[in-house]
Amino acid sequence: MVREEIAESTRTLQWKCVESRVDSKRLYYGRFILSPLMKGQADTIGISMRRALLGEIEGTCITRAKSEKVPHEYSTVVGIEESVHEILFNLKEIVLRSNLYEIRDASICVRGPRYVTAQDIISPPYVEIVDTTQYIANLTEPIDLCIELEIKRDRGYRMKPITNSQDGSYPIDAVFMPVRNANHSIHSYGNGNEKQEILFLEIWTNGSLTPKEALYEASRNLIDLFVPFLHAEEEDINFEENKNKFTLPPLTFQDRLSNLKKNKKGIPLKYIFIDQLELPSRTYNCLKRSNIHTLLDLLSKGQENLIKMEYFHIEDVKQILDTLQKHFAVDLPKVLI
């Protein structure tokens, strides 16, 4: 556990981790401060950050399990102590860490008698099992247990659809929420008009990321939400209204992508953000540090200028070129004229 003394400050706004500890493989704790803030700012930031931490951070979960020998979810299998429903619940609790964005396959294939734990999950190399000791089932007889799994990265809570499985495939309620809890508190100091505040932020995570990583991702997500307001021009939007409702133009990435391919003038490039390009985190962070937030910013930069950026490599440029060609059928200019 790490603790640091907190000193009241009138210097430039800054943050610090004042306490950090690991209670278990699946419970990390961090306590942070941000100061000095003017009266009211701490509450504004604290409420926004808590919402972003609990609702905007992405996580990776097992979302489906399949075993052909299982007739239905509430059945039992000879030689297995747990019911199928209990096994599905245990799979739901497995904590994973990854940066994948598509559904990936994993599996369990073991023979009893033995305990089955998370260590027995055969997963893709870019998926890490945080706690390999997590319990799944107990095979009490010499039988084979083979389960096919689906792994997905998302955010929030996704309830499984209410359907009757016909092929032994069962969806799992997924909790894509690496942050278990987040609280904020405020300490005020000073007098009268000189009054200032210190924001205290506490974060508990499930071990798939540290509290500091969660704080970084939540901050980045909040910043991205406000990026459109930083553009000088206001885009004209036509609203179709009637007495009870109005219809907005399509805002999903897939709709934007489809329209862009049909007509490059259909969707302004400044409204397609680099978050949606699914770039590696290091490449993404380099672009963000250089104030490249949208596809328009990226195309305006040029290949040679990208290579000159700090920590940017030729492999990163190739990754961007491939992404632009694949999704948008456009090239990144080598040199700006």
UniProtKB/Swiss-Prot annotation:
- Which residue stretches belong to region Alpha N-terminal domain (alpha-NTD)? 1-233
Class of the enzyme per the UniProt entry, highest EC level: transferase
Which Pfam family, just one, is annotated for this protein? RNA_pol_A_bac
Q: Show the InterPro entries listed in the entry.
A: DNA-dir_RNA_pol_insert, DNA-dir_RNA_pol_RpoA/D/Rpb3, DNA-dir_RpoA, RBP11-like, RNAP_asu_C, RNApol_insert_sf
EC numbers listed for it are 2.7.7.6
Keyword field contains Transcription: yes
Keywords carried by this UniProt record: Chloroplast, DNA-directed RNA polymerase, Nucleotidyltransferase, Plastid, Transcription, Transferase
Q: Where is this region: Alpha C-terminal domain (alpha-CTD)?
A: 266-337
Biological processes per GO annotation:
DNA-templated transcription
Originating organism: Dioscorea elephantipes (Elephant's foot yam)
May I ask which residue range the UniProt record assigns to the signal sequence?
none
Q: What is the lineage of its organism?
A: Eukaryota, Viridiplantae, Streptophyta, Embryophyta, Tracheophyta
Among SUPFAM superfamilies, the record links this protein to: C-terminal domain of RNA polymerase alpha subunit, Insert subdomain of RNA polymerase alpha subunit, RBP11-like subunits of RNA polymerase
| Quaternary data | In plastids the minimal PEP RNA polymerase catalytic core is composed of four subunits: alpha, beta, beta', and beta''. When a (nuclear-encoded) sigma factor is associated with the core the holoenzyme is formed, which can initiate transcription.
Member of which family? Belongs to the RNA polymerase alpha chain family.
Q: Name where it's found.
A: Plastid, Chloroplast
Q: What is this protein called?
A: DNA-directed RNA polymerase subunit alpha
